[in-house]
UniProtKB/Swiss-Prot annotation:
Subunit structure: Consists of a catalytic RNA component (M1 or rnpB) and a protein subunit.
PANTHER family: RIBONUCLEASE P PROTEIN COMPONENT
GO cellular component: ribonuclease P complex
Protein name, UniProt field: Ribonuclease P protein component
Signal peptide (from-to): none
GO BP annotations listed: tRNA 5'-leader removal
Transmembrane segments: none
Catalytic reaction(s) noted: Endonucleolytic cleavage of RNA, removing 5'-extranucleotides from tRNA precursor
Enzyme nomenclature, EC number: 3.1.26.5
Gene Ontology molecular function: any one: ribonuclease P activity
Family the entry assigns: Belongs to the RnpA family.
Pfam families xrefs: Ribonuclease_P
Annotated gene: rnpA
Lineage: superkingdom: Bacteria
Taxonomic source organism: Campylobacter jejuni (strain RM1221)
Length: 108
């Protein structure tokens, strides 16, 4: 995630949620907005679990994003963890995330 910045304002989140594409995968929802900027946000609500579980979920999603980062187009990405993310293995989540990114046409 060296090349990607974090979201800084609420308006950035709103624009991606409203204008961007959305795809539901097992364990995660992916939002993508094609842009010249490279930004990422990882979100886990309290529905996912307590703070320890939410932080672990976000760490896993960041690690998976770092794995795919060099193959992705520039744009704004938001990954929202679902409550079932805690039950999935890393490899299964990786497969689902790759499939979702492919469906959103995020790969170069």
């Amino acid at each position: 995630m060296k090349n990607f910045d974090k979201f800084s304002t609420n308006e950035e989140f709103s624009s991606v949620y409203k204008i961007g594409k959305k795809w539901h995968c097992e364990g995660v929802i992916i939002f993508y907005l094609n842009s010249y900027e490279k930004k990422i946000a990882v979100v886990a609500s309290k529905k996912v679990g307590k703070a320890v579980v939410r932080n672990r979920s976000k760490r896993i999603l960041r690690a998976l994003f770092a794995k795919f980062e060099r193959y992705l187009r520039d744009g704004k990405y938001i990954f929202v963890a679902k409550n079932e993310i805690t039950e999935l293995s890393f490899s299964r989540l990786e497969k689902n995330l790759k499939w979702g990114l492919k469906k959103l046409e995020c790969f170069k």
